[in-house]
Amino acid sequence: MSSSEEVSWISWFCGLRGNEFFCEVDEDYIQDKFNLTGLNEQVPHYRQALDMILDLEPDEELEDNPNQSDLIEQAAEMLYGLIHARYILTNRGIAQMLEKYQQGDFGYCPRVYCENQPMLPIGLSDIPGEAMVKLYCPKCMDVYTPKSSRHHHTDGAYFGTGFPHMLFMVHPEYRPKRPANQFVPRLYGFKIHPMAYQLQLQAASNFKSPVKTMR
């Protein structure tokens, strides 16, 4: 990013295609070293990455080395993601994400009986690189893969495993009621007895695939 651009690095990053789930972290939060405790041990090129996020002038050596600049850019994205996971557990962060939730920015539950319930991003792990972001439905309380493939490469650790639950602890008034209806399998209009599934599983376990003949 050049110094002539008016948009901040944070706004630029959150505006990238595929980063729609992120909110813009307040710079005051990032500048408070207490909020960044321990992140210097997780992120390579920590100091340069932090300077990039805060739009501080880079070192001259960095400007003359494009390969190094790419590494710093990757580190800045990782650092911002980890800061973001902490920020959205604060009152200010929750308020920003709540607004996006109410606007349906994170998508809607694909389950029919959830009736287009808005969802929230969630991580299945707090460790970067272990799992991509998923979407949590507060109505059926299950998780789903984002519909758009552009979100399939967003690290789940940048949202954390506890974010949706913290949001509803702070704002219980936004917790939806559990679904009133549940799908009931039927055959010729009759409910299928649970024993039928057990019999099907037993039959499947005894089933042997036909031997393929060699041509």
Swiss-Prot record:
Its main location: nucleus. Zn(2+) binds at C109, C114, C137, C140. The modification Phosphoserine is found at S2. It is found in: Nucleus. GO terms for cellular component: cytoplasm; nucleus; protein kinase CK2 complex. Residues 188-193 are annotated as: Interaction with alpha subunit. A motif (KSSR motif) lies at residues 147-150. It comes from the Eukaryota. Phosphorylated by alpha subunit. GO terms for biological process: Wnt signaling pathway. Coiled coil: none annotated. Regulatory subunit of casein kinase II/CK2. As part of the kinase complex regulates the basal catalytic activity of the alpha subunit a constitutively active serine/threonine-protein kinase that phosphorylates a large number of substrates containing acidic residues C-terminal to the phosphorylated serine or threonine. Participates in Wnt signaling. Belongs to the casein kinase 2 subunit beta family. The KSSR motif is part of a protein interaction pocket that mediates interaction with cellular and viral proteins. Casein kinase II/CK2 is a tetramer composed of an alpha subunit, an alpha' subunit and two beta subunits. The beta subunit dimerization is mediated by zinc ions. This is Casein kinase II subunit beta. The lineage of its organism: Eukaryota, Metazoa, Chordata, Craniata, Vertebrata. The gene is csnk2b.
